Amino acid sequence: MALVNHRENVKGRAQILAIGTANPKNCFRQVDYPDYYFRVTKSDHLIDLKAKFKRMCEKSMIEKRYMHVNEEILEQNPSMNHGGEKMVSSLDVRLDMEIMEIPKLAAEAATKAMDEWGQPKSRITHLVFHSTLGTVMPGVDYELIKLLGLNPSVKRFMLYHLGCYGGGTVLRLAKDLAENNPGSRVLVLCCEMMPSGFHGPPSLQHAHLDILTGHAIFGDGAGAVIVGCVDPSGGTNGVVERGVRRYEQPLFEIHSAYQTVLPDSKDAVGGRLREAGLIYYLSKRLSNDVSGKIDECCLAEAFSAAIKDNFEDWNSLFWIVHPAGRPILDKLDAKLGLNKEKLRASRNVLRDYGNMWSSSVLFVLDEMRKGSIAQRKTTTGEGFEWGVLLGFGPGVTVETVVLRSVPTAKLK
């Protein structure tokens, strides 16, 4: 493919300089989760529904997930256990839990990213944070300033309620901030924790079974990256002097970023915050909407800006795709004609963590980087120079981020 040569402008491109992730301590094996879920919600009498849920979990391609809500929490807060037509008011309990725990998990991921970055925290100039839940004023961004010991004059951007595409949104915003504020370093965070989304199973007669689908795939997690524009003339050899790394080490370059709404897809996925918590809707058509429209509506537009001529070989890219679920990944594979290994990083994250909403693509980004190094690939993009990050969620809104890898030989 013929790519626009922009090496002379690389100083102005935003780069991902470090990545950190974190999960709650409670790990649930997928094979055990149906028995656990129906037991703690006192729903073992729903035999047919439990069998249906077991089949969902078996087909999910997930092996384990991490969640804050455990049996002890449910025993202390029985109002969270009800499902279907028996849901009761429990929003206060759920929000209080999220307001308390989301900042802690986000701070853990941020600390890992800053440790890898190796620079003084005083260099952080901007903070971008997203969480679908846990709304409070002042927000989690305010709490993170205190928890991380950041300068109180750090410029903060707080985003709520975006859902699964939020991981792409924060990167797009961070790119604009880094490239338009010389010398800036942007701490970017997504943290998703689902106390508001935990409900007991509905009855078979109840029409809304989407909650059951969510319980088969959703997990909690936080991802953090640091974004800035590094002058390549300064080198990237990671020399450490007096405990401070002299040079930063870019992992990926954020070449461009786009947001698109897929046509006629508003009802494919969404949610409403009710007195009983978050009630979400997951249409069976979601996988078809995403796989059927994403190439024409998103990929073609995004890569037309970076590629001079028509481009058809999607296998010449590395792929960082939101692991929304097995059906979406399978259909995207088939629609784009991708080789089997192309969505390896996304499938690995789905297997080990489930769908962590907006945080997921940051986990996939980390998996891509680590897997490339472990397999001795020549670049952080599995040996490929160019790649794409896709986040999608309610709308259906799609964030398309064009990335450029760096040679793994530069990483020490």
Swiss-Prot record:
UniProt cross-references to PROSITE patterns, sorted A to Z: CHALCONE_SYNTH
Enzyme Commission code: 2.3.1.-
Biological process annotations from GO = orcinol biosynthetic process; polyketide biosynthetic process; terpenoid biosynthetic process
Molecular function (GO) terms for this protein are:
acyltransferase activity, transferring groups other than amino-acyl groups; identical protein binding; protein homodimerization activity
Which InterPro entries does the annotation name?
Answer: Chalcone/stilbene_synt_C, Chalcone/stilbene_synt_N, Chalcone/stilbene_synthase_AS, Polyketide_synthase_type-III, Thiolase-like
Q: What tissues harbor this protein? A: Mainly expressed in young leaves, and barely in mature leaves and twigs.
Report which reactions are catalysed by this protein: 3 malonyl-CoA + acetyl-CoA + 3 H(+) = orcinol + 4 CO2 + 4 CoA; 3 malonyl-CoA + acetyl-CoA + 2 H(+) = orsellinate + 3 CO2 + 4 CoA; 3 malonyl-CoA + acetyl-CoA + 3 H(+) = tetraacetate lactone + 3 CO2 + 4 CoA; 2 malonyl-CoA + acetyl-CoA + 2 H(+) = triacetate lactone + 2 CO2 + 3 CoA
Give the positions the UniProt entry annotates as the active site: C164, H322, N355
Metabolic or biological pathway, per its Swiss-Prot or TrEMBL entry:
Secondary metabolite biosynthesis; terpenoid biosynthesis
User: Pfam families, from UniProt?
Assistant: Chal_sti_synt_C, Chal_sti_synt_N
Name the top EC class.
transferase
Describe its assembly. Answer: Homodimer.
Family of the protein in this entry? Belongs to the thiolase-like superfamily. Chalcone/stilbene synthases family.
So what does this one do? Involved in the biosynthesis of acetate-derived aromatic tetraketides natural products, precursors of daurichromenic acid, an anti-human immunodeficiency viruses (HIV) meroterpenoid consisting of sesquiterpene and orsellinic acid (OSA) moieties. Accepts acetyl-CoA as starter substrate and produces orcinol as the major reaction product, along with four minor products including OSA, tetraacetate lactone, triacetate lactone and 2-acetylphloroglucinol.
Write the protein's name: Orcinol synthase
Highest lineage ranks of the organism? Eukaryota, Viridiplantae, Streptophyta, Embryophyta, Tracheophyta
Name the encoding gene, please: ORS
